[in-house]
Amino acid sequence: MKTKKQGSNWTAYYDPDTGRYFAEIMYTSREGREQYDYEITQDVYSRLGTFSDDVDNERLIKTAKMTYSFENTMYGTLGPERTVWDEEAREAMRACEEKQTVKERKNKQKQTAKERNNKK
């Protein structure tokens, strides 16, 4: 199973070690930044990326349990600047993201080494 899916403003992760699914929606502009993290279900994860419009993917993600929000815009915050709804889920999502990043780096290094060997 694919462990990472991505759209314009969203990224979803599957952690095979824990069997959990997470998604992040992030908006950035000159006005500021907004970030929302969710713990999603396998059903939501499997449907992500099947829509022709990313807005539909974001709507699907928003049906899940929100675990974290961050809003910092030039218009002021819409509540507490940072709100952690579920600390354990947020930490699990960050660990999953880190695993994905390490995995992607290793794959990139392998690909680079393979390309160097092919040039010799």
Show the residue positions of the predicted features:
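A short, exposed loop/beta-hairpin motif centered on an aromatic-Gly-Thr core
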Residues: 34-46
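Mixed-charge, Lys/Arg-enriched low-complexity segments
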Residues: 44-110, 120
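Long, compositionally biased stretches
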Residues: 1-30, 67-75
